[in-house]
Amino acid sequence: MRKPADKAQVDAELQRVVELRHPEPHAVLGIHPDGDGVVIRAFRPDAVAIHVLPESGGRVAMTHRPGGVYEARINGKDQTFNYLLEVEYPGKRVFTLRDPYSFLPTLGEMDLYYAGEGRHERLWERMGAHLLHHHGVRGTSFAVWAPTAAGVSVVGDFNGWDGRLHSMRRMGSSGIWELFVPEVGEGTRYKFEIRPGQGGPNVLKADPFAFRTEVPPATASVVHDLARYTWGDAAWLEQRAQRRDVHHQPWSVYEVHLGSWRRVVEDGDRPMTYRELAPALAEYIKFTGFTHIELLPVAEHPYGGSWGYQVGGYYAPTARFGHPDDLRFFIDHMHQEGIGVLVDWVPGHFPRDLHALGQFDGTALYEHADPRKGAQPDWGTLVFNFGRNEVRNFLIANALFWIEEYHIDGLRVDAVASMLYLDYSRKQGEWIPNRWGGRENEEAIHFLRELNETVHRKHPGVVVIAEESTAWPKVSAPVSEGGLGFDYKWNMGWMHDTLSYFSKDPIYRQYHHNQLTFGLLYAFSEQFMLPLSHDEVVHGKGSLYGRMPGDPWQKRANLRALFAWMWAHPGKKLVFMGGEFGQPAEWNHDKSLDWHLTHDPGHHGILQLVSDLNRIYRDMPALHDADGEPMGFQWLQPDSAAYNVFAFVRRARQPGRHVVCIANLSPTVRENYRVGFPFQGRYVELLNTDAEQYGGSNLGNMGQIHTEPTGWDGQPASATLTLPPLSVLWFTPG
């Protein structure tokens, strides 16, 4: 016979439960041995009466103790005794429920060990909220990391948001709190109420691992079952896994903000949903010929004006456009239409919103405590503590989550430079040097290398792309060679120089000729992607079309030339939506693109050009399969500054396959202009941006040329050409 529990001790422990200060409420609530029977305790301060309903039948009244605790002693039973609680509330409202404190933990020792080590690669399957059958009972298991909290409870629709009712238990020294709540189902809203261990008021936090959220500005997490969706993209995933060397593939990326690509004007100008976007966007991408789309961040974010770059819910797609399975449908549809999907991902910083990750358990948990490392001055955000195992695990598991649960084909990592440098956007005295006295963030470097190695090990064919704006070496080199391990790096230098050149009046371009040639000095130092991204059409910069000089005809001609120059240049391609048809207005995230312009002949001509560029680019290995290799590019005329003319050859790895590109970026027609060619014979015109179907003046070379055995530009053959104004020509042997 067990000795009955000491009443004073029980009272003291119950008081700690009431105050949300008990790390193990299961030790006093629920069912416990007591003498030759058991004692059952429940904390329901809002109840009028509670009865125990034994599984074998009967009804036992519980005694109401002070403070809202109910207790019943039942002789001749042990802890295997199964029961329900019948709870009566004011107004004779009666509910029968399972006691949440009668269940064993849902987390195992190995889960806790690997989470603490920072090596739990499927962390989202254990943390957060999970619908499951536990000991034969349907409900939801909740788990949250809050190591310094004095107490944690889960609150929501199921308990009237009363933080006293569902206190969680701390799982040893892991800092993880857990509770299984029976009968909580799909669609239930919830948060965690945390009592800081250092004192102060309780805080309400959204679940860092929530799979679904309310529609902002509401901030609650929502219980969601991720196991219901049936995918139809197995063929795409199989083909992707077999594509081991992504650098030899054509990559032409269309960057999209889902909330403003196209809006439903007849329904209050609302954004399209994920399911509405899927067929419309896929049809458009197939027409324009892009290989991939890249979505501005789709993870939940409290402020729409951040475009998704200040993430509040890393494991939940934004509810603005639908539910998680709706986004899965969107990606599934893209894959079935042969379109890859990349997603912008923000592991460098997060917002200060009170419901989010900042000061999560009353301390700097996900961020650094010292603002010299933990605050991002440019954006007013907080910086992740990459040196903490649990934080690093949270982020790397999140990357794997989007790949495995949403089948995305790649991550574009935002603001990598802000992660790599401790003094990024900080003045002297506002940052802390590393252990060697330098400004390199060793913890972030380790994190990025671990991220890239993990993604590539587990998911061959998936790419990780760095938005990195400095001269940091070996960003796209393998970790084994001392690199960071990314597949591609955005070429920000190329973007700045190219836009600067094309925005100048042609009369001045001869003095800035090197802005287009300089990039070839470092074009093969990394695996580059050439970005004309959303960042270049906001904050008063205007649109790509608007930055081009001249009258409307010249603006369109310049933009066509820019695109053809870009598609011929070494490096993969990325264009933000609206640029492909020359939208004059700067991008506004609250407005649809100006789709009516695609019916204007001039703007439709730009769109048709981009479609043809993508088609030729995909079909011609010379334009993509040696992007990162010096043998894939050769200058013919890098120094014709006085004429604003450039000429070069793009070569494939297979000998003999090549494309000659000639750009005349002046408004003057160049007649009888001689250019060297690798072969003597017939060359066909692959592209002429001045063609009539693109809105040009239709000058050119009648679709073909015949080179003669006159050496020129270091080549054995040459031809005299007509170079249309503000144009780019492509030729290939035919």
UniProtKB/Swiss-Prot annotation:
SUPFAM superfamilies: (Trans)glycosidases, E set domains, Glycosyl hydrolase domain. One of its GO terms (cellular component) is cytosol. InterPro entries: A-amylase/branching_C, Branching_enzy, GlgB, GlgB_N, GlgB_N_E_set_prok, Glyco_hydro_13_cat_dom, Glyco_hydro_13_N, Glyco_hydro_b. It comes from the Bacteria. Its EC number is 2.4.1.18. It catalyses: Transfers a segment of a (1->4)-alpha-D-glucan chain to a primary hydroxy group in a similar glucan chain. GO terms for biological process: glycogen biosynthetic process. It is an enzyme of class 2 (transferase). Keywords: Carbohydrate metabolism, Glycogen biosynthesis, Glycogen metabolism, Glycosyltransferase, Transferase. The active site is at D414, E467. Pathway: Glycan biosynthesis; glycogen biosynthesis. Catalyzes the formation of the alpha-1,6-glucosidic linkages in glycogen by scission of a 1,4-alpha-linked oligosaccharide from growing alpha-1,4-glucan chains and the subsequent attachment of the oligosaccharide to the alpha-1,6 position. Belongs to the glycosyl hydrolase 13 family. GlgB subfamily. This is 1,4-alpha-glucan branching enzyme GlgB. It comes from Myxococcus xanthus (strain DK1622). The lineage of its organism: Bacteria, Pseudomonadati, Myxococcota, Myxococcia, Myxococcales. The gene is glgB.
